[in-house]
């Protein structure tokens, strides 16, 4: 009796390995069970734009699999529409073209209704995708770049609406000149652009000659000088008077060789 119960349990274990669709089964091992992930289920879609947006949401969340219910979708056009949406996400969509390695789909049924099962593999981690900085306006870009320079980031990924070409290296040089007490070294910036629509994704890579620790040490030393100089030059007076005070401060504090 005990042996029969064990055999029945084994049969049930095999039958529980069902796919995202009805009536399809896969062989399951204990390792597969422990690592299996429940597919994300999207809201039901009825139009091409809803279908495409649902795919985009799966990608933006870093989901590896998902099911899109299409019970009220025109069945005759679903196959063509999902193929077009897949190409759009992988080519035109800024996050998709940056993050997606492969996006496959299968049309079937879920709970007796038409649905699309999606599987996605990525070039970047879910954490990288979710940490993309999303700007409300391109006018916010300079503040984000300044923050990256202040933090000595080696890389910054930014989603920009209404994108226009920008000389990021010139922006960084201008920020370095305007903030000498913060930016110790002007890095070389590589700007890779993803997407083909109005919104684009910018992947900025900052290359420094000096290490992060060295720059932080330099910043600490420079801050002391700036703080002292600001006290020395503070108060009312003309620009020429302040220039003279600053000159006096620098001559008293440092030795110079011509």
Feature locations, PLM:
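Intrinsically disordered, low-complexity N-terminal segments that are enriched in acidic
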Residues: 20-205
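C-terminal motif of bacterial Sec signal peptides marking the signal peptidase cleavage site
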Residues: 14-17
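Secondary-structure boundary elements
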Residues: 215-258
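Short domain-boundary/entry signatures in modular proteins, especially
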Residues: 121-140, 211-227, 253
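Positively charged n-region of N-terminal signal peptides that target proteins for export
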Residues: 1-4
């Amino acid at each position: 009796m005990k042996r029969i119960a064990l055999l029945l349990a084994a049969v049930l274990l095999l039958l529980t390995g069902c796919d995202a669709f009805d009536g399809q089964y896969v062989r399951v091992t204990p390792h597969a069970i422990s690592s299996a992930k429940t597919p994300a289920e999207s809201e039901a879609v009825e139009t091409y734009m809803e279908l495409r947006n649902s795919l985009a949401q799966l990608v933006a969340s870093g989901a590896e699999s998902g099911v899109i219910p299409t019970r009220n979708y025109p069945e005759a056009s679903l196959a063509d529409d999902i193929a077009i949406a897949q190409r759009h996400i992988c080519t035109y969509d800024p996050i998709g073209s940056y993050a997606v390695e492969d996006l496959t789909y299968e049309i079937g049924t879920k709970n007796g209704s038409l649905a699309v099962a999606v599987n996605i593999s990525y070039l970047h981690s879910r954490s990288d995708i979710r940490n993309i900085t999303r700007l409300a306006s391109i006018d916010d870009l300079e503040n984000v770049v300044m923050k990256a320079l202040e933090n000595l980031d080696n890389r910054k990924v930014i989603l920009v609406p209404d994108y226009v070409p920008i000389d990021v290296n010139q922006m960084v040089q201008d920020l370095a000149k305007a903030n000498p007490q913060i930016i110790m070294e002007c890095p070389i910036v590589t700007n890779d652009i993803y997407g083909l629509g109005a919104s684009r994704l910018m992947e900025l890579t900052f290359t420094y000659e000096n290490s992060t620790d060295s720059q932080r040490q330099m910043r600490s030393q420079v801050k002391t000088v700036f703080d002292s100089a600001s006290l020395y030059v503070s108060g009312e007076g003309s620009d020429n008077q302040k220039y003279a005070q600053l000159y006096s401060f620098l001559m008293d504090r440092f030795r110079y060789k011509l």
